[in-house]
Swiss-Prot record:
It comes from Treponema pallidum (strain Nichols). One of its GO terms (molecular function) is structural constituent of ribosome. The keyword Ribosomal protein applies. SMART domains: Ribosomal_S10 (SM01403). Involved in the binding of tRNA to the ribosomes. InterPro entries: Ribosomal_uS10 (IPR001848), Ribosomal_uS10_CS (IPR018268), Ribosomal_uS10_dom (IPR027486), Ribosomal_uS10_dom_sf (IPR036838). One of its GO terms (biological process) is translation. Part of the 30S ribosomal subunit. It comes from the Bacteria. Keywords: Ribonucleoprotein, Ribosomal protein. This is Small ribosomal subunit protein uS10. HAMAP family: Ribosomal_uS10. Belongs to the universal ribosomal protein uS10 family.
Length: 102
């Protein structure tokens, strides 16, 4: 018999915001009385971009930029209506993308 669970996935560019949001979600869910697994850190995705410093000369002179995407996974085991209300009432940072799957 499979246990019902909700999977919350957090993504963001700032690791502190992602961790702060994951702590807020875990605290709210535990306060509502559900079992929580996580936050589980997922691999950080790094995108590197190399561009020319000058628009028309100095081909060897280049600049590199990096964009890191941090991810966390939280599983909520057998959620109740109180847990769902607690999740919907949370105010999270604008820099964190939250995806909820059932």
């Amino acid at each position: 018999m499979a246990r019902e669970r909700i999977r919350v996935k957090l993504c963001g560019f700032d690791v502190e915001l992602v961790d702060q949001s994951s702590r807020a979600i875990v605290h709210a869910v535990q306060k509502a009385g559900a079992e929580v697994l996580g936050p589980i850190p997922l691999p950080t995705r790094m995108h590197k971009f190399t561009v020319l410093r000058s628009p028309h000369v100095n081909k060897k002179s280049r600049e590199q930029f990096e964009m890191r995407t941090h991810k966390r996974l939280i599983d909520i085991i057998e959620p109740s209506q109180e847990v769902m209300n607690a999740l919907m009432g949370l105010e999270l940072s604008a820099g964190v993308d939250v995806r909820i799957k059932q």
